[in-house]
UniProtKB/Swiss-Prot annotation:
Database matches in InterPro entries: Histone-fold, Histone_H2A/H2B/H3, Histone_H2B, HISTONE_H2B_site
GO molecular function annotations of the record: DNA binding; protein heterodimerization activity; structural constituent of chromatin
Membrane spanning residue stretches: none
Protein name per the record: Histone H2B
Classification lineage: Eukaryota, Fungi, Dikarya, Ascomycota, Pezizomycotina
Modified-residue entries (N6-acetyllysine), positions: K8, K9, K15, K25
Pfam families registered for this protein in UniProt: Histone
Keyword terms, alphabetized: Acetylation, Chromosome, DNA-binding, Isopeptide bond, Nucleosome core, Nucleus, Ubl conjugation
Biased composition (Low complexity): 11-21
Length: 140
């Protein structure tokens, strides 16, 4: 005859009975406290790199009295990451088509022309050329 529902013992799933669990936790807590004091190295907080500071600087150059919300900054950061990835991928494909192992400014410029539409591509190319020229002259 099968046991009644009230008579069934709850399955512990291979764990210790509930009565002994607090004592084990205390011991484990003491061990971790001792280990944290000097045995193991603490992990630092992982840094997440964003374009937030650069976006903020550009915003202040264009509109000094305007602020930006955290959500808007997050959206702009995602946008910059997306465009960067698209340009890098396209430049990589162009270098592979031309059997080159190095991505140069020429591949970047061509990929920008392919990805961005019309007038936006022209402005991006001119600003990029200006930035590269400024960098080259200051590096000498």
């Amino acid at each position: 005859m099968p046991p009644k529902a009230a008579e069934k013992k709850p399955s512990t799933g291979g764990k210790a009975p509930a009565g002994k669990a607090p004592a084990e936790k205390k011991e484990a807590g003491k061990k971790t406290a001792a280990a944290a004091t000097g045995d193991k190295k603490k992990r630092g907080k992982t840094r997440k790199e964003t374009y937030s500071s650069y976006i903020y600087k550009v915003l202040k150059q264009v509109h000094p009295d305007t602020g930006i919300s955290t959500r808007a900054m997050s959206i702009l950061n995602s946008f910059v990451n997306d465009i960067f990835e698209r340009v890098a991928t396209e430049a990589s494909k162009l270098a592979a088509y031309n059997k080159k192992s190095t991505i140069s400014s020429r591949e970047i410029q061509t990929s920008v022309r392919l990805i961005l539409p019309g007038e936006l591509a022209k402005h991006a190319v001119s600003e990029g050329t200006k930035a590269v020229t400024k960098y080259s002259s200051s590096a000498k």
